[in-house]
From Swiss-Prot:
Protein name: Ubiquinone/menaquinone biosynthesis C-methyltransferase UbiE
Similarity comment text for this entry: Belongs to the class I-like SAM-binding methyltransferase superfamily. MenG/UbiE family.
Role of this protein: Methyltransferase required for the conversion of demethylmenaquinol (DMKH2) to menaquinol (MKH2) and the conversion of 2-polyprenyl-6-methoxy-1,4-benzoquinol (DDMQH2) to 2-polyprenyl-3-methyl-6-methoxy-1,4-benzoquinol (DMQH2).
Coiled-coil zones: none
Gene transcribed to yield this protein: ubiE
GO biological process: aerobic respiration; menaquinone biosynthetic process; methylation
Keywords: Menaquinone biosynthesis, Methyltransferase, S-adenosyl-L-methionine, Transferase, Ubiquinone biosynthesis
Residue numbers binding S-adenosyl-L-methionine: 72, 93, 121-122
InterPro entries given in the database record: SAM-dependent_MTases_sf (IPR029063), UbiE/COQ5_MeTrFase (IPR004033), UbiE/COQ5_MeTrFase_CS (IPR023576)
Classification lineage: Bacteria, Pseudomonadati, Pseudomonadota, Gammaproteobacteria, Cellvibrionales
PANTHER family linked: 2-METHOXY-6-POLYPRENYL-1,4-BENZOQUINOL METHYLASE, MITOCHONDRIAL, METHYLTRANSFERASE
Pathway: Quinol/quinone metabolism; menaquinone biosynthesis; menaquinol from 1,4-dihydroxy-2-naphthoate: step 2/2; Cofactor biosynthesis; ubiquinone biosynthesis
Length: 249
């Protein structure tokens, strides 16, 4: 396999063309129990990580927001309240199973007029240039085949001065925490997946994909290379998760 045509699916080296299909299989499998597993895996702490993301977004009434890899709609729901009737939030996800769960959940909660849905690949965003005031991608970038291409696409569809926020698992900043986290990720997570979703393999992939994702400083550099300015990151829970923020010049 040529290095130019390969990428990582967890620890496995695969053809770049095959990764999206394999990631899709993971999320088709876990979509129905995705919210439950998030609560169980993180002890509910993911809600605090997302709350901080919302607070840092600077989203105001009337803004247009794109929630990439928006899945079951946690961030979309909060943004929809912030932008109000004059604003718009687009929940985008490449996976139709996740998108359906998110749409059903938000409709049940009464989010109708200011939320739209798009099945979209982060690398090939189907929106005009300079469309959005803010873009978020939460726990989705590590699953993208070509992260540099996706970051460039996000820069393209942001308005000048618009903000990108990337919430993602990252590298723990303490060696003891890192060892404990690896033990949890590679042993406990797959066991939880098997018990709750009858799917240990998908959560084994989750652990591997986290390990293979760029660390905080590397991702900051990738955002800068994609054209973002004022890039910085905020470590949460000891660096297990990091929130990166950049602005379109």
């Amino acid at each position: 396999m040529s290095d130019e045509n390969t990428t990582h699916f967890g620890f496995e080296t695969v053809n770049a063309a095959d990764k999206a299909e394999r990631v899709a299989g993971v999320f088709h499998s876990v979509a129905a129990k995705y919210d439950l597993m998030n609560d169980v895996m993180s002890g509910g702490i993911h809600r605090l990580w997302k709350k901080f993301t919302i607070e840092l977004s600077g989203v105001r009434p009337g803004d247009r927001v794109l929630d990439i890899a928006g899945g079951t709609g946690d961030l979309t729901a909060k943004f929809a309240r912030l932008v109000g009737d004059e604003g718009q939030v687009v929940l985008a996800d490449i996976n139709d199973s996740m998108l359906k769960v998110g749409r059903d959940k938000l409709v049940d909660k009464g989010f109708l007029g200011n939320v739209q849905y798009a099945q979209a690949d982060a690398q090939f965003l189907p929106f005009p240039d300079n469309t959005f005031d803010c873009i978020t991608i939460a726990f989705g970038l590590r699953n993208v085949t070509d992260k540099d291409m996706a970051l460039a696409a996000m820069n393209r569809v942001l308005k000048p001065g618009g903000r990108l926020l990337v919430l993602e698992f990252s590298k723990p900043q303490n060696s003891l925490l890192e060892k404990a986290y690896d033990l949890y990720s590679f042993n406990v997570l797959p066991m939880m997946g098997k018990l709750i979703t009858q799917d240990a393999d998908s959560y084994r992939y989750l652990a591997e994909s986290i390990r293979m994702h760029p660390d905080q400083q590397t991702l900051k550099g990738m955002m800068e290379n994609a054209g973002f300015a004022q890039c910085r990151y905020y470590n949460m829970t000891g660096g297990i998760v990091a929130l990166h923020k950049g602005t379109k010049a």
